[in-house]
Structures are given as C-alpha cells and as structure tokens.
Design a protein with these regions (language model features):
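Short alpha-helical segments that sit at the start of domains
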Residues: 1-32
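Charged low-complexity interaction tracts in eukaryotic proteins
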Residues: 2-11, 50-51, 58-97
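Short, solvent-exposed secondary-structure capping/transition elements
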Residues: 34-37, 50-55
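Short basic/hydrophobic patches in alpha-helices and adjacent helix-turn junctions
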Residues: 26-28, 43-47, 66, 317-324
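Short acidic, hydrophobic short linear motifs in intrinsically disordered regions
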Residues: 32-45
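Intrinsic-disorder/coil detector with helix-boundary
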Residues: 96-373
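Short aromatic/basic micro-patch
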Residues: 35, 79-80, 309
Length: 374
C-alpha cells in the first residue's frame, strides 16, 4: 500500500486538485480492493491536510463517475476506486502505483452468473431485496452489466454480492461472463443460478434444486464410424465441487424444512409433492434437448445424471482455470421441465426456488464455508 503523503508529495501543491486528493486517499485506503465511506476518506485526509480537506466529499465522489463507483446505497454509501481512477492517478503523479495486492486479495464475496435476465436474474434480484436494493457497478467498456447489493448473514456481517448475465445462452457465453466477473470483482464464491431440465429418476418435482457435482460437458468426445455406423466416444472432463462446499450442502438433503419455508413465499400454484435438493452429475452442452432418446444416450455414460442444461460447465471451467485467489464455485438450478416434456409454465417457479434457496444457503452457511473471512 502507498501512503497518502507519498501520493500528495508527487504533485506540486498548486496542481493538487480536489479530485486528485480524494482519489489519492481512495488508493491509500485500498478502495480498489475494499470499498470505503466518505468519512474514512475525510479522516485520512485530515491527518495530512488538516483543515484543507476538500468540502463535501460525498458530492465530489458522485461527480467522479468515471473513476469511482458506489458499492452500497447506504447509509453510509461505500465507494470503490475503479481502474480508470488508478490510471488517472498514475498519469498525474508519475508514480507506478503497483496494485499487486489486487491480484492477491478477494474484492467481493459472491459473484452470481445467470443465463437469462428473465426469469433467472429477475428472481435473484427479488430474493435480494428487489430492484431498488441494487446499483450498477463496473467498467462500462465491458459487454456485461454488473449489479451489486449487500446480503446480511447470520452473525450480522454484510456480504458484497455482484451479479451479471451472460450475453446469450450456452457454454461459451457463460464462460466469458464468469471470467470477466472473476477478473473484475474477485469473489470468494461464484454461483450459477437459474433453471434446468431434470431427469425423471429420483422422483423429481418442478422446482427441485439441482446442484451440479460434477458438471459434465457430455458433447466432449470423438465421432467415429464403426462398421459403417456413426458412433460417439465420450471424453468428458468433469469438474466437481469444493469438498467443504459439498459437505455443507449435505445438510440440506432429503426434504429439508427450508424448502417448505420457501414454498410458502410463492403466491401461486406449487407441485403436489415437497421440493428438495439433488446433488449429482449435471450434463451441459450448447443445445436445447427436446428428445427423450438423447437423455437415455447421455445416461448410458452417466447413470446418476440428475439434469441437463446449457451453462454450468462453462462457469465451472472458467473458475477452475481462474487465477489465484481462486473462488469456489457452485450451481443452483431448479427443475422447470423434463427435457422432452417441454413446458414454460414452471419456469418462474423454478427460477424463484433456485434463487431463494441459493440466497438462504449463503445467508445461513457463509461462516461455515469461510469461518475466518469476516
């Protein structure tokens, strides 16, 4: 970390604008890693400038949209220093301003990736306070829109949550969205939240939550001709859950009471049988399946398959190959149909169940996953 005195002394007194001084304080406070309040900025500057601190720092921060971003609507509002702000400081000061700590630290707690704005992201935003609880953050040069909010967990701490959607359905778009999210916000946990097709085994209901462990790209392999017949030799590279995450999830097996609590919040029709959690292999590929025979083909190579969808493997693979500090990753997708038995009537309910369960799981189990992170 570079202190404020060094940043101030790098610029002649008459050339120190209020903007430079405030950005210098943000950098010294590591606001590019952890957001800070205007009060923290003022207190830091008072140590070096005494009574010459810029007036109305909050109003100034609102005017520096290219350089800073609000991460919490407050009160108090918390502010992050954006990459453009650091570049501006470098340009004015001539200092190198190393941000190696940025590559070595988490900057947020949960990064959420959805394939669809409706119904998936809409359900996530509603589960976390509604549209009014979120603010747009991030660099506008990127294709994705990022929204941020906070989640109060058991014990009283607040988590920084960042959510985005892929630009389209499918593995490639999901992998790109996840990679960009991880590189910009460095979350401790990446969660894919949405809807999926379930398999008929295991007495699944609409709204049952599927957690991919592992996620499998079932289209990975080799097409061959044997005896004049085209065949397929699968060569998947399954990616599973972090062992600690898997263990904590096991607490919600069978018909956990949480699912009944969530169902009571839904104001329309629900399935006749209770909803529950299924943890197991989920297949992923860039195709919508509307053919029962294809499900049977996939199950030949994965008899414990619990569902199929189009994005999770891209998310898992992006996290698997992410730089350190590497996040953990999980996918919560609820059953909206049964592949060949297509119906849109349960999509809203499935998105609701996936989002509500994911949020409750994080709220209740965060300290079990990261007991020393707060």
């Amino acid at each position: 970390m570079m202190d404020v005195a060094t940043l101030l002394s790098a610029v002649k007194r008459k050339e120190r604008t209020d903007q430079y001084v405030i950005l210098a304080a943000l950098f010294a406070l590591d606001a590019h890693i952890t957001s800070v309040t205007a009060k923290q900025i003022v207190e830091t500057l008072q140590l070096h400038l005494g009574a010459d601190v810029p007036t109305n720092v909050n109003a100034s921060l609102r005017a520096y949209k290219a350089y800073v971003s609000p991460t919490d609507k407050g009160p108090p509002i918390r502010w992050s220093l954006m990459p453009k702000g650091i570049e501006h400081l470098r340009s004015v000061s001539g200092l190198a301003l190393s941000i190696a700590s940025d590559a070595e630290s988490y900057r947020s707690d949960v990064g959420i990736v959805c394939a669809l704005v409706h119904p998936e992201l809409a359900a996530v935003m509603k589960a976390l306070g509604g549209v009014g609880a979120w603010v747009e953050v991030g660099d506008a040069r990127h294709a994705h829109i990022y929204r941020e909010t906070n989640l109060s967990i058991e014990g009283g701490a607040k988590l920084r949550i960042v959510a985005t959607t892929a630009t389209s359905m499918g593995l490639t778009a999901a992998a790109i969205a996840t990679t960009q999210l991880v590189l910009q916000f460095r979350p401790r946990l990446v969660a894919m939240i949405g809807i999926a097709a379930g398999t008929r085994s295991g007495d699944k209901q609409f709204g049952d939550v599927l957690v991919a462990d592992p996620s499998v790209d079932y289209n990975s392999g080799k097409v061959v001709f044997e005896g004049g017949i085209r065949g397929f030799q699968p060569d998947p590279y399954p990616i599973g859950l972090d062992p600690r995450l898997r263990t904590v999830l096991q607490k919600y097996g069978s018909t956990h009471p949480l699912f009944g609590e969530i169902r009571q919040r839904w104001k329309s029709a629900v399935p006749s049988k209770p909803n529950r959690l299924h943890v197991g292999p989920v297949g992923a590929a860039d195709q919508v399946i509307d053919d029962a025979t294809l499900i049977l083909e996939i199950q030949k190579n994965g008899r414990k398959l619990i569902g199929v969808e189009m994005e999770t493997y891209g998310v898992y693979r992006a996290v698997y190959e992410a730089p350190e500090p590497k996040p953990r990753v999980v996918s919560f997708k609820a059953v909206c149909d049964f592949a060949a038995e297509k119906s849109d009537s349960w999509q809203e309910y499935a998105a609701f169940m996936a989002a509500e369960f994911a949020v409750e799981f994080v709220r209740r189990e965060w300290t079990a996953l990261w007991p020393k992170s707060q």
